[in-house]
């Protein structure tokens, strides 16, 4: 068309540049629209990816993944998914052989209300599973503290000791500035934390510079002062902190705030639950043996030997 229009070379160059700019702008708009459309899916995939990355394992054994939206996991009126997960946990715990029982339940994102969290907490407590989930994605630590206080999520009920709640969302990827995206993609930190918990010795909390560092994470939603970290830890949250050039968890609290200090620390709760399940499994295997003084001594001896082998220094 330009050649047939008898235009000069300079006019043709200018026209080509205008068309190229228009096409480039249209491409950027369409790419940005595509990014916005798949954002929730991208969040989900990146969240699962960070769980795997933080296990530091080439292959993970004994894992089950449920494809469910947050709406399905918080709907108490139509509790199909909640019941299905509860049945799966119960089927592997309410039995004689406990080798296939679950120990971690990861629910990335904010469950939204105290009644929903209590529903999940009771399921976890009944099956001796530790839940890792998240608080709301907010922009400032003061907002987190205020909203958490108003939500009344922590409490003295024993089942609250089976829930850990992280805050300060992770930067899953930086924003695409060339496309006009204005904000980084933030993802819930509970999956990355649970991945680190998966690889760490059960009695050791996954927190601090040495044990709490998150792999392949560059940043967090907001920076935290030492006083703010202390306040978040005090109210029962697990804040993600960027210091020393890395992102780390800086608390080991559960949502339990009763008098029993042990139940406020998730490593203690997990060890208690594990020891209970080991002893239950052991005694199930010794059921209906003839009972005499020799059998009693043998049983007591094996239990004492096991408990001695796992005691601290």
What are these regions (language model features)?
Residues 2, 57, 68, 76-78, ...:
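Short linear motifs in intrinsically disordered/low-complexity regions
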Residues 3-43, 47-50, 56, 91-313:
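Structured, hydrophobic secondary-structure cores that serve as assembly/anchoring elements
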Residues 43, 62-71:
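Charged, low-complexity intrinsically disordered boundary/linker segments
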Residues 67-94:
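A short, well-structured beta->alpha microelement
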């Amino acid at each position: 068309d330009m050649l047939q229009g008898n235009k000069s070379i300079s006019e043709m160059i200018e026209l080509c540049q205008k068309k190229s700019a228009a096409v480039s702008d249209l491409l950027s708009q369409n790419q940005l629209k595509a990014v916005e459309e798949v954002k929730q899916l991208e969040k989900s995939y990146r969240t699962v990816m960070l769980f795997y990355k933080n296990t530091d394992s080439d292959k993970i054994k004994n894992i089950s993944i449920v494809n469910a939206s947050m709406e399905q996991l918080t709907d108490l009126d139509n509790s199909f998914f909640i019941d299905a997960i509860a049945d799966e946990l119960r089927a592997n715990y309410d039995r004689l052989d406990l080798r296939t029982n679950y120990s971690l339940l990861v629910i990335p994102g904010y469950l939204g209300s105290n009644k929903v969290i209590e529903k999940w907490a009771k399921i976890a407590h009944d099956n001796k599973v530790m839940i890792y989930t998240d608080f709301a994605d907010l922009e400032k630590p003061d907002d987190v503290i205020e909203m958490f206080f108003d939500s009344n999520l922590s409490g003295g009920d024993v089942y609250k000791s089976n829930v850990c709640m992280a805050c300060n969302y992770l930067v899953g990827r930086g924003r695409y500035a060339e496309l006009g995206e204005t904000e980084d993609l933030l993802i819930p930190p509970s999956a990355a934390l649970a991945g680190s918990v998966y690889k760490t010795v059960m009695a050791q909390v996954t927190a601090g510079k040495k044990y709490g560092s998150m792999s392949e994470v560059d940043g967090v939603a907001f920076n935290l002062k030492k006083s703010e970290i202390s306040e978040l830890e005090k109210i029962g949250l697990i804040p993600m902190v960027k210091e020393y050039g890395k992102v780390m968890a800086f608390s080991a609290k559960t949502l339990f705030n009763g008098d029993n200090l042990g139940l406020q620390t998730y490593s203690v709760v997990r060890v208690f639950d594990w020891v209970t399940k080991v002893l239950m499994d052991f005694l199930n295997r010794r059921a209906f043996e003839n009972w005499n003084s020799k059998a009693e001594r043998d049983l007591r001896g094996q239990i004492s030997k096991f408990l001695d082998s796992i005691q601290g220094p």
